[in-house]
């Protein structure tokens, strides 16, 4: 949504000078296209999506539940509240990040968790999305609520 008034990521043109336009990146869980600059589009034999410099006001459609509802739905698992470091391979989608948060039992916070690592592949993580919360906090040009993911690899004590 590159034309939202007073939004941080709004711009009439991308970094290549191409006019920006609204587009839906994912519909019903299906990827509609990539974020392509003029250069990357040429390399792939595709058309630019006017995204040189990245996305413009990327908004993930919220679900019906707030964070408390997502925790109840999870029942047992890890609520990640902090990610540490930068361990994402953008070519393969593999990631490994330090994390901290809270362990959940019976839909309630049981205890704090720190010095753990979450790892996996972004494709698998995106496929495992169960729900997106309605608790989004604006952060720059991205807007997304809490995300409930079916399963992730966690290491630590």
Regions found by a protein language model. Give the residues of each.
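Dual-mode signal for accessory low-complexity, basic/Gly-rich regions
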Residues: 1-157
């Amino acid at each position: 949504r590159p034309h939202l008034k007073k939004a941080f990521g709004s711009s009439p043109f991308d970094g290549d000078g191409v006019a920006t336009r609204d587009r839906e990146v994912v519909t019903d869980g299906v990827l509609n296209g990539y974020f392509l600059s003029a250069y990357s589009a040429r390399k792939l034999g595709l058309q630019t999506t006017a995204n040189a410099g990245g996305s413009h006001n990327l908004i993930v459609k919220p679900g019906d539940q707030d964070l408390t509802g997502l925790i109840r739905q999870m029942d047992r698992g890890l609520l990640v509240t902090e990610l540490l470091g930068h361990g994402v391979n953008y070519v393969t989608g593999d990631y490994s990040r330090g994390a901290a948060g809270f362990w959940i039992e019976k839909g309630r916070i049981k205890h704090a968790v720190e010095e753990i690592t979450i790892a996996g592949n972004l494709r698998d993580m995106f496929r495992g999305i169960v729900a997106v919360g309605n608790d989004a906090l604006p952060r720059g040009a991205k807007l997304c609520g809490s995300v409930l993911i079916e399963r992730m690899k966690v290491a630590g004590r």
